[in-house]
Each structure stands twice: as structure tokens, then as C-alpha cells.
Amino acid sequence: FAIRRQRQMCIRDSYISLPKFYIDFNDRKSRNSANDVKNEIIKLKNNGIVGLILDLRNNGGGALQTVVDMTGLFIEKGPIVQVKSTGNRKQILYDKDPQVVWDGPLVILMNKMSASASEILAGALQDYNRAVIIGNEKSFGKGTVQNVIDLNRFISNSSYDLGALKITTDKFYRINGESVQLEGVKSDIVI
């Protein structure tokens, strides 16, 4: 997580690099990338920034609820992503908070290694016409949701750590209904 402030030709733009959508599973409410980015944006606004660049290049994803919360920093409220599980059971995840932390110009940088949660954020903000996506022709194209199961919670073993199992449980779709699986999020400006 890095922040760089630049001043060019009397225009103030700020840059936030986000390598993944992290969360502390022991303190989900306060220790996550959405809260950290929110706090940084508030500081940057107090310093008079005019534009914001969010760098998601090489961001392979992360916690689903964190990306929903982060998307909510840039829109009033509404659907963020559709999640479909076995049997085509569909759940729509919403931003329910009408507070917008940043409503100014927003650029998202992506590349071929931007995947999963990065594609949820970029796709939703593109669907809301809220951000300009700049990068490779398209992002990675990972339209699936995975869950981590801590095996130590299910099997009693005091001798050693049993580890965890990561399984794919759902597919996700943009709010416009499109899948990013193998297709990715297409950049508005290709560099």
C-alpha cells in the first residue's frame, strides 16, 4: 500500500497503489484495505487534491466484502456485483452507504495481472461511468469467488498446523450482467 503525492502545472493529483484487497479476519470491520484507502483519501482531500489515480496493476484480488466496501467509496449507493453459486442461485452485493468519499476525477490503472476483486472494482466503476480505466487491452479475466477453509477449525490437532483449503465456490458478474471470466475488464484507454 503506497501513496505518492505529485504537483504538476498547479494541478494536484494523488496516486494510491493497492497490491491486493486485504482484510484482517480477526478484525474485519476496521483492518482492511477499504478503510485504509478511505482514510488516505480523506487526508488527501484535506490537502486539496483534484484527481485520484488508483493503481491496481498486478493486484490479484482479495476479500470480496472489502472490494464491495471500497467501490462504495466512489458511488452513492447501489449494486456492485452479482454472485452466482451452484444452481444459479444469485446474490447481488450492494453498497448501502450513500456517503461518497471521493466524487472527483478518478483513473484506475490495470494490466493483464489485475484480477478478481480488481476486476469487480474496475467493472463496477466503469458501469457507473465513475472512472476511466487505463492499461492493457483487458485485465486478467478471473470471474470466480474463492473461499478459504481453515482446517484447524474442523479437526482437533495440537501437534501441528493442518493448513487451509482454498476452493472456488461461486462465479461473479458485473452489474450489467457481463462475466469477466476469460474476458477481463476492457480498458477505456489502452497503453
What is the meaning of each model-derived region?
Residues 4-8, 12-155, 171:
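Cleft-lining beta-strand/loop regions that shape enzyme active-site pockets
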Residues 14-16, 167, 180-181:
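Short hydrophobic-aromatic micro-motifs
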Residues 148-160, 187-190:
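Beta-strand-rich C-terminal secretin pore/gate domain
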Residues 159-171:
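Short acidic, Pro/Gly- and aromatic-enriched capping/linker segments at domain boundaries
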Residues 174-191:
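Conserved functional hotspot residues or short segments at active or partner-binding sites
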